[in-house]
Amino acid sequence: MMNIILIGARGAGKSKVSRSLSKQSEIPVVSTDSVAVYETGGIPIPKFVENNGWKAFRELEYSILQKLQNANGIILDCGGGILFDLDESGNEVLSERKLDLLRKIGRIVYLERGIEELVEKVKGDKTRPDLSKITTYRSILEKRLPVYQEAAHFKLNLTKLSKEEAAEKILDWIGIKSKSI
């Protein structure tokens, strides 16, 4: 069975859509962020990044994707930075190695929202690591959004869709019948 991979910016709705997809298809969800917390012995991601830096976190994501490359029949809910690594200067760059693994793992679905909508959604969310130390979230989005678009096999704009409608569209695209109808 094919794996479904959800990518998109922080606050796009990947976790909500992945849960709805799972409910409709009975395919289990694996979250790269949840696996990262598990792999670090329960350390929340913001704390891990604070202690070890973003580069170490991006390495951890890569090792998680390596472990998942033979997965079969999962919905992979990816953290917002999954497509990126840091260069020598600490700038975000496309991670060819992670994108290659994601393409091996399954079909990549980009869940899209507008920049303003995303900025509003994540303002003051204490459960997420602070991105402002790198640069403003808006400028991060301006760099990341074209990369998500380029990486995806399928793009879905969530602005006017409920999570259930989004899940139905993804299942239709993949050719899996929804179990909740």
UniProtKB/Swiss-Prot annotation:
It catalyses: shikimate + ATP = 3-phosphoshikimate + ADP + H(+). Its EC number is 2.7.1.71. GO terms for cellular component: cytosol. It is found in: Cytoplasm. It holds the Pfam family SKI. Pathway: Metabolic intermediate biosynthesis; chorismate biosynthesis; chorismate from D-erythrose 4-phosphate and phosphoenolpyruvate: step 5/7. ATP binds at residues 11-16, 128. GO terms for biological process: amino acid biosynthetic process; aromatic amino acid family biosynthetic process; chorismate biosynthetic process. The keyword Magnesium applies. GO terms for molecular function: ATP binding; magnesium ion binding; shikimate kinase activity. It is an enzyme of class 2 (transferase). Substrate binds at residues 33, 58, 80, 144. Gene3D superfamilies: P-loop containing nucleotide triphosphate hydrolases. Its cofactor is Mg(2+). Binds 1 Mg(2+) ion per subunit. Keywords: Amino-acid biosynthesis, Aromatic amino acid biosynthesis, ATP-binding, Cytoplasm, Kinase, Magnesium, Metal-binding, Nucleotide-binding, Transferase. Its main location: cytoplasm. Mg(2+) binds at residue 15. Monomer. PANTHER family: SHIKIMATE KINASE, SHIKIMATE KINASE 1, CHLOROPLASTIC. Catalyzes the specific phosphorylation of the 3-hydroxyl group of shikimic acid using ATP as a cosubstrate. Belongs to the shikimate kinase family. This is Shikimate kinase. It comes from Leptospira biflexa serovar Patoc (strain Patoc 1 / ATCC 23582 / Paris).
